[in-house]
UniProtKB/Swiss-Prot annotation:
Source organism of this protein record: Burkholderia thailandensis (strain ATCC 700388 / DSM 13276 / CCUG 48851 / CIP 106301 / E264)
HAMAP family given in the database record: Chaperone_SurA (MF_01183)
Keyword Signal found: yes
Function text: Chaperone involved in the correct folding and assembly of outer membrane proteins. Recognizes specific patterns of aromatic residues and the orientation of their side chains, which are found more frequently in integral outer membrane proteins. May act in both early periplasmic and late outer membrane-associated steps of protein maturation.
Domain PpiC per the UniProt entry, residue ranges: 185-288, 301-399
Compartments (UniProt record): Periplasm
SUPFAM superfamilies in the cross-refs: FKBP-like, Triger factor/SurA peptide-binding domain-like
Region Disordered, residue ranges: 230-249
Domain observations: The PPIase activity resides only in the second parvulin domain. The N-terminal region and the C-terminal tail are necessary and sufficient for the chaperone activity of SurA. The PPIase activity is dispensable for SurA to function as a chaperone. The N-terminal region and the C-terminal tail are also required for porin recognition.
GO cellular component: outer membrane-bounded periplasmic space
Catalytic reactions of this protein: [protein]-peptidylproline (omega=180) = [protein]-peptidylproline (omega=0)
Protein's recorded name: Chaperone SurA
Amino acid sequence: MKKTLRFAAVAAGLVASLITVAPSASAQALRAQGASLADEVVAVVNNDVITGRELDQRVGLIARRLQQQKAPVPPTDQLRAQVLNQMVLERIQVQRAKDDGIVVDNATVQATLGRLAQANGMPLDQYKARIEAQGVPWDLFVRDARTELMLSKLREKEVDSKITVSDAEVASYIASQRGPNAGAQQDLRLEHIFVKAPTNAPQADIDAAQKKAEGLLQQALASGTNFERLAKSQSEADDAKKGGDLGFKAPSSLPSDVVDAVSKLRPGEVNPTLIRVPDGFEIVRLVDRRASQNPAASPKIVQTHVRHILLRVGEGKSESQARQQLIDIRRQIEAGGDFEKFARTYSQDGSASQGGDLGWISPGETVPEFERAMNALQDGQVSNPVRTEYGYHLIQVLGRRDAEGSVQQQMDIARQAIGQRKAEQAYSDWLRELRDSSYVQIKLPVGQ
């Protein structure tokens, strides 16, 4: 299987992992949140509306999800406003997708649901039963899955497909990682003050945040201002208590806008303009520069040492039989059985004679389903049965290591990192422009 599995992976499927098992609030909980608002319009979005019932359902789901994750649940007013804003952005994008003729067929939705069921270690019928047992109607779950897929296709069409990365940018990125010669690269020590203003926030909130940030910038630029003290009292970043001190950072680890801004500064100077980042506004002060502590570093790849047991479907073995056999084998391994012996006995892959050992695998060398499952495992952990085009697998990760990789792998990593950074910024800009060009009227009553 090593030779069979190790081919360049095709583009991964749409991001099914975004759609997780999360129960909706019960009807009783929804009523408690304000039954009188159930059918009241809380937002007008172009020619569409969002009702109180829809908002309550989404708020209940998110509140339950936060509780499950043991994360703090914001005050009701704040949570409702945040969720409504998310729903407005989602509705605008769905409208745009429909205008663009983007559709998601049933086969694609079913394939996504199948991957979700597999990721949760169960067949689709069991997965459906679990979703419904947790209070989420299956048709609602399927609809949300279809929406996620539609928005992924929209982003691919409107944003991601238009991102280009030149060979010169790749070369520059690699050079910034390695340095043209020892000691040539300089790490930067920065302090910053951050004011939150997510791109998807209401425009009024963004304007207010910008006004606050501009006031803080003027204070930071004023003679005699203690930047560290100002950051401690005003910054909304997690490092505010440290005076916004980021420590020394390699330029490649910082947003390009920040690097460009501080490149013109002398130590001790504050950048004279605000820097817009996806989550808000940054005020940056250059504290110091120093020769890179790792000038020869190259872009690294993470290799995974993995072994597996493969059962092929067909040849007298059905889908359910192959899957059940691997469930039984996994149960025995978890009880202390020897993975290697099971692989030698049952695996139908060429690696069976090596106990299923595939050696060290680099990113992109396996099919996407196998790689996603492998990447989700901790060292020593055994997966649930994983379906690929080859059959069903049990996968065990034996270890991970950083490796420099080939020249081509380094270029691929650089291109991916640059493209990802560009795509996130482009998506934030596009989403802001899309909202600005839409008619949105928020009717959410104050205190509800």
